[in-house]
A protein has these predicted regions:
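Surface-exposed binding patches on compact interaction domains or structured appendages
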Residues: 27-41, 51-137
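C-terminal motif of bacterial Sec signal peptides marking the signal peptidase cleavage site
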Residues: 16-19
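Bacterial signal peptide processing site
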Residues: 21-23
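Sec-dependent N-terminal signal peptides
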Residues: 4-13
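A short beta-strand micro-motif common to beta-rich folds, especially ectodomain repeats
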Residues: 136-142, 147-160
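C-terminal edge beta-strand
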Residues: 161-173
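Hydrophobic residues positioned within well-ordered beta-strands of beta-sheet architectures
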Residues: 54-56, 138, 152, 165-167
Length: 173
């Protein structure tokens, strides 16, 4: 009888212990893949046909809002894109090029569930983006300008709590 009671005690203790274990959760409600980003005059990442592009990786456990902030409101030297270019490929996986040797591209939307708000002087240039839980890669495109140092701040905050991350962006000479 004592043996059965001991087995039942161990069994119920194991059931209670496993029922209290929470599923995997992120240690932070929001992460941003880089801090104090410096963009050299020669771009750190190039797009398919030479565009100056940097990708931010945002991982959040809930709704978030990302904003590009500038020292001057008319200084839109970088912006968030709602899509990015990928190379067109043939049935064998080779990149398709035109008669001049340029890679043919097609536009891909960033992600479903990401909402863009206009803020630039042209279509497709955004300063504010909202998204939901999960991981999102946001492309930021920027203009090169020789001999000029420019600044911006990329700020991401959780909309349902007082929690944010930001990175300072500097374009060097």
């Amino acid at each position: 009888m004592k043996k059965i009671l001991a087995i039942l005690t161990v069994f119920f203790a194991a059931v209670v212990a496993t029922s209290c274990v929470k599923p995997y959760e992120l240690t932070e409600p929001l992460t941003l893949d880089n801090y104090d980003l410096t963009i050299p005059k020669t771009a750190n990442k190039k797009g398919i046909n030479g565009e100056n592009i940097h990708y931010f990786c945002i991982t959040a456990t809930g709704d978030w809002e990302a904003t590009l902030e500038f020292p001057s409101t008319d200084d839109l030297w970088c912006w968030l894109n709602d899509s990015y270019s990928v190379a067109k490929k043939d049935e064998y996986g080779n990149q398709i090029k035109d008669e001049y040797g340029r890679i043919q591209t097609e536009q891909v939307k960033v992600a479903s569930g990401v909402e863009y708000f206009p803020g630039g002087e042209e279509d497709g240039k955004f300063r504010v983006v909202r998204g939901s839980a999960g991981t999102t890669y946001l492309p930021m495109q920027y203009n090169d300008n020789a001999g000029v140092v420019r600044y911006a701040t990329f700020r991401v905050r959780r909309t349902d709590m007082d929690y944010e991350k930001f990175t300072n962006i500097t374009q060097s000479k």
